[in-house]
Amino acid sequence: MAFRRRTKSYPLFSQEFVIHNHADIGFCLVLCVLIGLMFEVTAKTAFLFILPQYNISVPTADSETVHYHYGPKDLVTILFYIFITIILHAVVQEYILDKISKRLHLSKVKHSKFNESGQLVVFHFTSVIWCFYVVVTEGYLTNPRSLWEDYPHVHLPFQVKFFYLCQLAYWLHALPELYFQKVRKEEIPRQLQYICLYLVHIAGAYLLNLSRLGLILLLLQYSTEFLFHTARLFYFADENNEKLFSAWAAVFGVTRLFILTLAVLAIGFGLARMENQAFDPEKGNFNTLFCRLCVLLLVCAAQAWLMWRFIHSQLRHWREYWNEQSAKRRVPATPRLPARLIKRESGYHENGVVKAENGTSPRTKKLKSP
């Protein structure tokens, strides 16, 4: 892992060299961009990597506010923050997770899952706080009608656009991390599924100008995922601690219901009642019946798939639990061997002395002297 003291050197730009030094390589690239800010010739190009592009001034009653829309230059900004995320990933891994896992003495399988949950706990916790702050300051919680009113939401505030760029950067960085972290082949399909699922939903909300609805749905989803991975960390620390899993199971079903309700309310009813329903990609308007059906189908299919996996996992867990209980009941108790009766011819022994049947010691026969 990056930033560690290494005792073994690898050939330059070899596979092992890149794996063990990928965070250092990313840090060097980020440093080059930051150095570019110091010179007037390269400052404009450096700002292209660091700051969101496509800003416009929107006049208001008091003054002007700066808003943003998306474009191809966003890919450059996302690339820069992919390297930032790789560096932060390595810092969390080395200075937090590795120190904790050494004390727990986990197996290889549990160690891999512990690292995965540890990284996602940090990410989900940060994203929940950030997303909640954006939603509250922009007034999306107090005014639910703003999720579909004035669509298309082409002009985004700075914090909304920056949030989406960082989200895309994080989930894109998770793809090469599968290679850098040497994830087991059995785990790669499962992780690819939820990485691609997040990328499709976040990019879809960003490109289809459904950013307000996307923020609310991400807030709900990330809150549930944070609870799940926190429960898994506590389980790895103490296998008897499963109380948080019960809380997560209750929250999971409620979250699926809320996500489906909000999606149907905003897309199926809110956007359907808007007057402007013409397909106009140049103006960012995708409010047509076909687009609404596709978005609703995607959201409903994703929630149904997550719910099916949840039910399947719960049934398997209960089946294993009842099998263990039935196995314990089938184990026969070890029979006690009957006490072995000792046949005594006359009297019995007590403390090494022969006793008569009436409890008295037999008198020793005196020998007559000749």
Swiss-Prot record:
Keyword Transport recorded: yes
GO BP terms, alphabetized: collagen biosynthetic process; protein insertion into ER membrane; SRP-dependent cotranslational protein targeting to membrane, translocation
Subcellular location: Membrane
Glycosylation sites: 55
Extracellular membrane side: 44-75, 141-159, 210-214, 272-287
InterPro entries: TLC-dom, Translocation_assoc_membrane
GO cellular component, one term: endoplasmic reticulum membrane
Residue intervals on the Cytoplasmic side: 1-22, 97-119, 181-191, 236-250, 309-370
UniProt keyword list: Glycoprotein, Membrane, Protein transport, Translocation, Transmembrane, Transmembrane helix, Transport
Residue ranges of the TM segments: 23-43, 76-96, 120-140, 160-180, 192-209, 215-235, 251-271, 288-308
Top-level taxon in the UniProt lineage: Eukaryota
Domain TLC stretches: 112-321
Complex and partners: Interacts with SERCA2B and COL1A1.
Task of the protein: Necessary for collagen type I synthesis. May couple the activity of the ER Ca(2+) pump SERCA2B with the activity of the translocon. This coupling may increase the local Ca(2+) concentration at the site of collagen synthesis, and a high Ca(2+) concentration may be necessary for the function of molecular chaperones involved in collagen folding. Required for proper insertion of the first transmembrane helix N-terminus of TM4SF20 into the ER lumen, may act as a ceramide sensor for regulated alternative translocation (RAT).
Protein name, per record: Translocating chain-associated membrane protein 2
